[in-house]
C-alpha cells in the first residue's frame, strides 16, 4: 500500500510540474495584448498639431484621434507617403469628414493586413500650419 501511495504521489508531482511548465511556456509565448494609442487633434497648448505627432504601433494596435482644440479637424493619409504609395490604402484609412465637436473621434485598428512602414497623415484645414503626423507600423 505504501508503495502505491508513493508512486501515486510521485506521478501527481510530475504531472503538476509538467502542467506548470507548459502553462509557463504558453504564457511567455502568447502575443502581447493590443494597445490603443490616443492622438489629440489640436494640442492642449492651443497649437495646430497632432499630439503626439509620431506613434509606433504593432499589428492589432489601434490609433484613436480625438478632437481636442481649435476645430475643425480631419485625418487624411497622404497617398504618396504610405507603404507602396497606394492611393487605395490612403483612401481606406482617411476620414475626410470634418469633426467640429470636442471629443469627437475616429479610430483605425492596424491589423496584420496593413504593410509595415510609415504612414503620413495630415489635417486638411491645417496642413499649411504644420498639422501633420506619422504612424510607423512595425512588423
Swiss-Prot record:
Where is Cu cation annotated to bind?
73, 123, 126, 131
Cofactors demanded by this protein: Cu(2+)
Task: Specify the Plastocyanin-like domain's residue ranges.
Answer: 35-139
Q: Name one GO cellular component term.
A: plasma membrane-derived thylakoid membrane
What's one Pfam family the UniProt record gives for this protein? Answer: Copper-bind
Per UniProt, the keywords (alphabetical) are: Copper, Electron transport, Membrane, Metal-binding, Signal, Thylakoid, Transport
Where in or outside the cell it occurs: the entry states: Cellular thylakoid membrane
The Gene Ontology terms for molecular function here are: copper ion binding; electron transfer activity
What the entry lists under CDD domains is as follows:
Plastocyanin (cd04219)
Query: Is Chloroplast given among the entry's keywords?
Result: no
Q: Which residues form the signal peptide?
A: 1-34
Membrane topology of the entry:
Peripheral membrane protein
The function of this protein is:
Participates in electron transfer between P700 and the cytochrome b6-f complex in photosystem I.
The family classification in the record reads: Belongs to the plastocyanin family.
Q: Could you identify this protein by its name?
A: Plastocyanin
Q: Which organism is it from?
A: Leptolyngbya laminosa
- Tell me the name of the encoding gene: petE
Amino acid at each position: 500500500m505504501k508503495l502505491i501511495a508513493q508512486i501515486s504521489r510521485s506521478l501527481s508531482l510530475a504531472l503538476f510540474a509538467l502542467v506548470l511548465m507548459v502553462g509557463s511556456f504558453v504564457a511567455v509565448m502568447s502575443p502581447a495584448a493590443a494597445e490603443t494609442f490616443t492622438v489629440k487633434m489640436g494640442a492642449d497648448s492651443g497649437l495646430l498639431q497632432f499630439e503626439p505627432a509620431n506613434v509606433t504601433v504593432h499589428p492589432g494596435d489601434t490609433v484613436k484621434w480625438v478632437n481636442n482644440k481649435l476645430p475643425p479637424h480631419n485625418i487624411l493619409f497622404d497617398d504618396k507617403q504610405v507603404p507602396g504609395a497606394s492611393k487605395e490604402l490612403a483612401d481606406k484609412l482617411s476620414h475626410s469628414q470634418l469633426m467640429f465637436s470636442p471629443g469627437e473621434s475616429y479610430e483605425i485598428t492596424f491589423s496584420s493586413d496593413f504593410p509595415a512602414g510609415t504612414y503620413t497623415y495630415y489635417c486638411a484645414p491645417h496642413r499649411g500650419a504644420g498639422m501633420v503626423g506619422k504612424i510607423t507600423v512595425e512588423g
